[in-house]
Regions:
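Sec-dependent N-terminal signal peptides
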Residues: 4-12
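Conserved beta-propeller blade repeats
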Residues: 13, 50-65, 100-118, 137, ...
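C-terminal motif of bacterial Sec signal peptides marking the signal peptidase cleavage site
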Residues: 15-17
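Bacterial signal peptide processing site
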Residues: 19-21
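Predominantly five- to eight-bladed beta-propeller fold
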Residues: 24-29, 81, 164-214, 219, ...
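Multi-bladed beta-propeller domains
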Residues: 26-52, 78, 86-102, 130-146, ...
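Beta-strand-rich domains and repeat architectures in extracellular enzymes and scaffolds
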Residues: 45-81
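Short glycine/acidic-enriched loop and turn motifs that connect beta-strands
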Residues: 71-75, 121-124, 166-169
Length: 255
């Protein structure tokens, strides 16, 4: 019994240390060494020091540009995505989020006073908002599953978001509970695999919810319960395939 308690204590300490490490900002060093500069070669090591520029969003008055950059730390074998804003007139750049969590998909509100974005700082990918200067971040959604993309209507009172929905059982262990250790998959139609991705019976669906001062309310699956198709379309799941109408009362999407 004493050994059991000792094992549990060591495990908890280890998990706590891992969690603390993940909450610390990821160290990013993108400076080139003297050897790399002298060689003048675009080596794999040099390429990994380069930031990957992601989604961009122009402010309503066209004076500021939001965009993301993903940086990598080779020693820790992980990366982090941060949000930046650039002043169109001066070219001045400010980093709005730090390297302690992934922050992506930034969008301006209608008057340019707030920024909506996705962040995993709460432990899963959820919708957040912050001031145009990056101050006062606030979590808007608190859903059980990750949100993969979203869009706020022009009026700022509705939001669509995309989540994976388990629609069908593909694993034999799900179909036959008495075969819990079975690793087989069961299919009766194509396609069961695309590139390196198996069809696991989960599909991306669009949900629409109210957006109030209290956050995001319960969403409604507009694709339909049990619908075995993705929107946006696989394999890229591009959020540009979903758009609010200018009056904010209708949603256009592909499926």
């Amino acid at each position: 019994m004493k050994n059991l308690f000792l094992f549990m204590a060591i495990t908890l300490v280890g998990l706590g240390g891992c969690s603390e490490k993940r909450s610390q900002p990821l160290a990013i060093d993108n400076s080139l060494t003297q050897e790399e500069i002298a060689a003048g070669v675009l080596s794999p090591e040099v390429m990994w020091k380069m930031g990957r520029v992601g989604l961009a969003s122009l402010s309503p008055d066209a004076s500021r540009l939001l965009y993301t950059v993903t940086w990598y730390n080779m020693q820790e074998n992980r990366g982090v995505t941060a949000i930046y804003v650039r002043d169109a007139a001066s070219g001045e750049v400010a980093q709005l989020t730090d390297f302690s969590s992934n922050n992506s998909d930034p969008k301006w509100n209608a008057d340019g006073s707030k920024i909506y974005f996705l962040s995993d700082r709460s432990g899963s990918s959820q919708i957040w908002e912050m001031g145009a200067d990056g101050q006062n971040p606030r979590q808007l959604s608190k859903l059980e599953k990750d949100i993969e993309g979203f869009g706020v209507n022009p009026a700022g009172d509705k939001v669509f978001y995309v989540q994976g929905v388990q629609v069908a059982d593909r694993k034999s262990s799900d179909i036959h509970p008495d075969m819990a250790e079975s690793k087989a998959r069961v299919y009766d139609d194509l396609m069961c695999r695309h590139w390196d991705r198996w069809d696991e019976g989960e599909y991306r669906h669009i949900f629409i919810a109210d957006l109030t001062s209290g956050g995001i309310g319960k969403g409604v699956d507009i694709i339909g319960e049990g619908a075995e198709w993705d929107t946006p379309l696989a394999p890229y799941f591009d959020m540009s395939e979903i758009a609010w109408a200018p009056d904010g009362t209708r949603l256009a999407y592909t499926c």
